[in-house]
Amino acid sequence: MLLSLNWLREFVPYTGTAQELGDRLTMLGLELEEIIRPFDAIADIVVGHVLECGRHPEADKLSVCRVDVGTEVLDIVCGAPNVAAGQKVPVAKVGVTMPSGLKIKKAKLRGQPSCGMICSESELELSDESDGIMVLPQDSVPGVRLVDLLQLDDTVLDISITPNRADCLSVLGLAREVALAFDLPLTMPQLELREQGEDAGSDVTIAIADGAQCPVYQGRIIEGISTCPSPLWMRHRLKSVGVRPISAIVDVTNYILMELGQPLHAFDLDLLEGARIVVETAAEGERFTTLDGQERVLKASDLLIRDGAKAVALAGVMGGANTEINDASRRVFLECAVFKPATIRRTARRLGLSSESSYRFERGVDQVLSTFAMNRAAQLMCELSGGVLRPGVCRAEPAPWQAAQLRFRPARAAALLGISLDDGFCRETLQKLGCTLSGADTPEWTVTAPSHRHDLEREADLIEEVGRVYGMDNIPPVLPKVSKPLEQGRTDSEYEFWARIKAWGRGLGLNEAVNYSFVGHKDLDFLGLPAGNRISIMNPLTSEQDVLRTELAPGLLNTLRHNLAQGSTGLQVFELAHIFEADQSSDTTARESGRLGLLVYGQRYQDGWPRREEDAGYEDLKGIVEHLLRVLNLGPAAFTLRKDHSWLLPCVEIRVGSVCAGVAGRVKPDIADAYHARKDVWMAEIDLDALRTLCRDVAVQFSALPVFPPVKRDITVMAPASVPVSAVTDHVRGMSLKLFSDIVLVDVFEPETPEGGTPERNLTFRLTFRHAERTLKDKEVDKERDKVAESLTEALGVRI
């Protein structure tokens, strides 16, 4: 945002320097990028009075002039056709460097000495006008600097405006901040409307199809205009803030845009048909030609302005070529509206039509101020173009502005900012921001936000405003208090814990995936995930990214699809990220949880001898999970069958002790097929917050290396297929066995099931026995094995 210091001073009596202003605004969160002096290049140009003007004796197209520049009279040869005696003109004396870089030197032109140059507007880079020299007002005093005469001695600040501060995209918005920072009064421009003729409030009827898309649309009629250039002061002011002057009518709309932040559009009223304006969405595939002469193909989500017969503007983005102001225009319909920011943003980005107007509509404009802005523009149009303003406003407002009401607790503000705050300071600050207060004598206030502050949505926003005005640099630095003992080896930091998990994944040879937090509602619906806990995005970049993910599966499955499209035959990836769920009990109405996603697909090993071409399966996924738990010193986990999962079948629940740490299983075939998978896809999603909590209670103890050798015995359990392996291993580990060390599954055999019989399988386990102080004897090992066999038979009903 370019801010003219002279323009700012029309709103606030600021007397300091540009640098002081920039530094203070920076501390308020409006960062100063650069200080510009836009007319420094013509600072040495002075006013000259042409005393005499005669034809050059050797050239018909040259004139020889004697010019009074205040301190001396110069002989200047000029080639402009419009130079004449008696004129007041801008003069560049010998030694002056022009904006183009040309340095003026004393010269002879066809034998006549020339000690300077009479300048045109284009040579001064004040406009594109190059037909002749620039003629100044007759009351101009010779020798006066041109920048002083035209009030061009200005300083412009380039301020970086954050996306949430749309109210600062105008001189008025920044003037509010300056008034707040320096405790200065704010003065609004004075309105002096001179209306003539009959009431025009019903001359153009306005219909709005959807009030959510267009809360208010209004316009005024101005008759008898002339499409003349705007005066020098307006052209130069617009140029100083980067806006190219065009004509008086168009320049006024741009002037109000920069001054008050309200985009406007001027229609040629005689080109509007049916005395009617309709605001509605376009038809899918509809074509419309904008002011730049380009035909645009529209979507059903684009908002159009129509008259009684045709589309006349792409709402909030650009007007139509069929109703633009031209040299023959005599009547103007001045449009002033407010549109839904998300709609304008989507249209502008899709069509690549970013403009100063769309930039402000995308971020939100002040609905309450819009009427004032329209009347201010109408007043200027009448003054500059000789028009007559008709009484009455053509207006439709289906959705009047509803001010946000927020709670504010001074005690909460003091706690959040870490300083002692006076209630009077908080009250005064909020009132200076334009807020109204009630209940200010109680611990909890009710604050009504002003219409121009769309970013004030919750108590924390008000506290931030109090902190801004107090001065973040005034908050004393204080070391954080240590509220618990520092224990070496504990990974209390989420960052440290996640770094540890990432190092584990990379060390295991897994590839790390990083996906967007945004997914589509349709992605979550396809996986059968509940809709009640979702957090929709108000202004999504695309319809495919309109909600925050509630699980990592959509992103990982899209990663799989992308890799398959690139010819991958096997994939083993992990992702550490947050998921987001709605939680009304939270201050932020959202709950954020850390998750680890694992995906295993296709070929287990890379191509090449001597590895076999095998596909990864459940045992690979389970092994990865078990390895992670061992690395975290969390001990063995129970994998219990779960029948009600939305996108995994079969699915097991991973339990560490009594805590559910996640799920694992095979992605349902129809879901896997939709992501172009032709083999089984195995996935796990693990709750990192639960693991981190469990890790805090783990005390790592040293275990001495065994001195005596182990003794191993195999045992085959013949059990119904419905008995899980974990039932056997958990039972054995839970027995009171003095010599037992470990149990692992080493073989599975599934014999044919006789007709009408119950499916069975033979599970062979390897039992490990060990004594820490001596070598075991076969007899005592066999006795322990027999205890295991007997206990399994009694507890699980299996055969040994």
Curated annotation (Swiss-Prot):
Residues 401-477 form the B5 domain. The keyword Cytoplasm applies. Disulfide bonds: none annotated. PROSITE patterns: B5, FDX_ACB, TRBD. It is found in: Cytoplasm. Its EC number is 6.1.1.20. Keywords: Aminoacyl-tRNA synthetase, ATP-binding, Cytoplasm, Ligase, Magnesium, Metal-binding, Nucleotide-binding, Protein biosynthesis, RNA-binding, tRNA-binding. InterPro entries: aa-tRNA-synth_II/BPL/LPL, B3/B4_tRNA-bd, DNA-bd_dom_put_sf, Fdx_antiC-bd, Fdx_antiC-bd_sf, NA-bd_OB-fold, Phe-tRNA-ligase_IIc_bsu, Phe-tRNA-ligase_IIc_bsu_bact. One of its GO terms (molecular function) is phenylalanine-tRNA ligase activity. CDD domains: PheRS_beta_core, tRNA_bind_bactPheRS. Residues 706-800 form the FDX-ACB domain. One of its GO terms (cellular component) is phenylalanine-tRNA ligase complex. Residues 39-147 form the tRNA-binding domain. SMART domains: B3_4, B5, FDX-ACB. It is an enzyme of class 6 (ligase). It holds the Pfam family B5. It catalyses: tRNA(Phe) + L-phenylalanine + ATP = L-phenylalanyl-tRNA(Phe) + AMP + diphosphate + H(+). Its main location: cytoplasm. Binds 2 magnesium ions per tetramer. Its cofactor is Mg(2+). It comes from the Bacteria. One of its GO terms (biological process) is phenylalanyl-tRNA aminoacylation. PANTHER family: PHENYLALANINE--TRNA LIGASE BETA SUBUNIT, PHENYLALANYL-TRNA SYNTHETASE BETA CHAIN AND LEUCINE-RICH REPEAT-CONTAINING PROTEIN 47. Belongs to the phenylalanyl-tRNA synthetase beta subunit family. Type 1 subfamily. Tetramer of two alpha and two beta subunits. This is Phenylalanine--tRNA ligase beta subunit. It comes from Oleidesulfovibrio alaskensis (strain ATCC BAA-1058 / DSM 17464 / G20) (Desulfovibrio alaskensis). The gene is pheT.
